[in-house]
Each structure stands twice: as C-alpha cells, then as structure tokens.
Amino acid sequence: MNSNDILIANTDDLRSDMDYLEKTLLKGHRIDPNLYEEYDVKRGLRDSTGRGVLTGLTEVSDVCGFDVINGRKIPAEGGLYYQGINVNDLINGLKGKRFGFEETTFLLLFGLLPKKDELAHFLKVLSELEDLSGRFVRDVVMKASSSNIMNALQRCVLTLYTYDENPEDISVENALRQALELIAKLPLIAVYSYHAYRHFRKDETLLIRNPEKGRSLAENILYMLRPDGQYTELEAKVLDVALILHAEHGGGNNSTFTTHVVTSSGTDTYSAIAASIGSLKGPRHGGANLKAQGMFCLLYTSPSPRDP
C-alpha cells in the first residue's frame, strides 16, 4: 500500500466516522412536534396559522399583505409604509432626475423627510464617510474572496471593528456615527467583494474604481460595478427604487429581530450588524432573492417553460 492508498483509507474511515456521529446526533435530539402546540411554542417568527409573532413594537415601518377576518387570512393589496408614509407615495414623489434612497434612509433614521438643506448636509456626511482605506481593501476585501457576497459583507463588517477607534461605545451618538459609516461603506464593500470574487474565483480582470462625488448611491454602485463605468438613467432609477423597497421591512423580520436579540446583550454595533447579515443571508429570508434569480435562469435556459 502506497501513501496515496493510506490517505484514501484514512479519508474513508473519517467519512464513516462522521456518518456514524451524524446518525447518533439525530437520534439524540428529537422533540415530539405535538409539544410545540401543547405549550404554545412559536417555531420561528410565525405561528401555526402563518401569522407573524408579536416580538416588539416599532413605528419605523409596517408591511400589510393580508387581512384577517374571522381567523382567516384574506389576500389584500400589499402595502409597505415607512414612518407611516406609503412607499408608493415616496417613489411617486421623486421627480425628474431625483434619486430617493438617501432621502428614504434619512426618513427611516430620523422619522421625517429631510428639507432641502438637511438632505444636502446628509449627503455630504455620507460622502465623507464612504471612503475605504487601501489597506482595508487589500488586506480584508481582497484576501480569501468568497463566492457568496453576503458572507463577504459579514466578514468585512466584523473587521471594520478593528478600524474603529471607539468600537465598543454604544451611546446614541456613537452608534449613529457607526450606522452612517456602514450605510456609506457597504455599497463599496459589496461591489469590491464581487470584483474580488470574479478575479480570484473566475480569473477575470480585477477592477477597482473609487466612487465619484456627486453621484447618488445607486449611480455609484453601477459606476463601480461596470467595467466601463457606464449605465443608463433607467438602470440607475430601477436600482434606486429597488434599494428603497429593500431598505426596511418591519421590525419583526428575521434579520431585524436578530438585531434586537444581539443588541440586547450590550454588544458592539459591528457584531450586531454582522449577525443580522448572517440572518439575512438565509434562503428563507434575503437569500430567497438568489432562489428567485435561479428560477428565472432556469426558465431562460429551459427549452420549454414546462420542462423541469
């Protein structure tokens, strides 16, 4: 038997041992499903009827997808509200070449739509906070590139802790500063992580472009993402609306609930947001977008829409 045979044999032994441990684990942790109903235990954030479980109160946003009449869910025209304002009204209120994500961010954070001078000041703050140091891009974003951008975001957010001179301070003032920095920096981290993935995993040309002052967040994402930096006004508008619609979905969704749980321990902002990103990544939450994209790709490549 040569060294390769020994390696294969050891690998087979390990696989057999792991199979045994897995079966033992599954046998040792089983709870009668009927006990959940008997003790009225909620398995997740919905009860047995599909209704959301009340875990807290919020005025930030609300989602309405159905009415409950006599204990039955009746489909209704969906509605999404930010600080009591219908999102449709927010989007319809955008005129000309205005972009609305930054205004929506201000609304969600501070509870009211910004005046012209307030918006200008807010945009200036975000612009000043968006820069990533070359050292961070080189040592964090480019190292150990991930095939999943959500995983890359989670890792980068955790590492931002070490670049913060006051990471443990959870006062309102400092937490707001950290939140604004994350809002400003995450688009860059997402785009750069994607380029790192394409370069190191797909052998594509590496492209890193700095954001350009004066562009909206949606415009800068496309500007940094595209090799030639070009995009149409329609593309930027569609992305801006998508960002608005994804900005917040009520205080009871999985990732927001994760934030409540993790921050209740008094931990730092970066740990809380990283945990929430991990929750958002799941296929039953934000990761469902990838599943939907996969369905479209399947329809596109199938000879017939009816083919599996």
Predicted regions: what is each one?
Residues 300-308:
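Single conserved hydrophobic/aromatic residue that forms the stacking wall/gate
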Residues 296-298:
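Helix-rich, well-folded core regions that mediate interactions or catalysis
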Residues 2-25, 172-176:
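Beta-strand-enriched accessory nucleic-acid recognition/scaffold domains that flank the catalytic cores
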Residues 16, 21-23, 27-136:
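An N-terminal structural lobe/cap that precedes and organizes the functional/catalytic core
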Residues 83-102, 239-240, 252-279:
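Short, hydrophobic/aliphatic alpha-helical segments
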Residues 106-114, 266-294:
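Conserved phosphate/anionic-ligand binding catalytic regions in large, soluble enzymes, centered on
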Residues 62-75, 124, 236-253, 260:
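An acidic intrinsically disordered interaction segment
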Residues 140-250:
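Glycine-rich, mobile lid/loop segments that gate access to catalytic sites or pores
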